[in-house]
Amino acid sequence: MTMELESQEVVVETTTAAAAARAASAAHVRTTVALRLLAFAASLAAAVVVATNRQERWGITVTFKMFAVWEAFVAINFACAAYALLTAVFVKKLVSKHWLHHMDQFTVNLQAASTAGAGAVGSVAMWGNEPSGWYAVCRLYRLYCDRGAVSLALAFVAFVAFGVASSLSRYPRAPPPPAPR
């Protein structure tokens, strides 16, 4: 006579759940790495586009160093690109760390703030604000403004990729559905 205990049944279910979690973890790691590499590429491209952006007209050369917000944009995008690359490389070791989500949130907020600040300055440059004495200058420096718009679009892509990666770091794996009885 064999007697089956409840604890034996739970052990079998737990083992199956652990195997399902490992399988979900591999897909989770691949997705996280892909998102972080996308954020790396977009942040790096946005920073490089702005850092190399310059236009000369009538003896006046416009560069990103003329505006503090663009300097901050470049610095933050380089920092976010470095963070994205480091976390993409070490994601298998970091996926279980609780502080990863907090750092991801910090990075998302930095990316959002730098993109919003640069976008606000770009908006004033594009359309101006005549009551305050700011005139639209993008008619004169069209190439500079177009490259700035491209870098803002790239930074927004990085922001979205960081946001999704941050969500995945908060909920690293979905629990398997309960077994039917």
UniProtKB/Swiss-Prot annotation:
Entries under Pfam families matching the protein: CASP_dom
Cellular component per GO, a single term: plasma membrane
Name the record gives this protein: CASP-like protein UU-1
Main location: membrane
Its membrane topology: Multi-pass membrane protein
Alphabetical list of PANTHER family matching this protein: CASP-LIKE PROTEIN 4A4, CASP-LIKE PROTEIN UU-1
Record key words, sorted: Cell membrane, Membrane, Transmembrane, Transmembrane helix
Protein family: Belongs to the Casparian strip membrane proteins (CASP) family.
Subunit structure: Homodimer and heterodimers.
Ranges annotated as spanning the membrane: 31-51, 66-86, 108-128, 148-168
Subcellular location: Cell membrane
Organism: Sorghum bicolor
Keyword Isomerase assigned: no
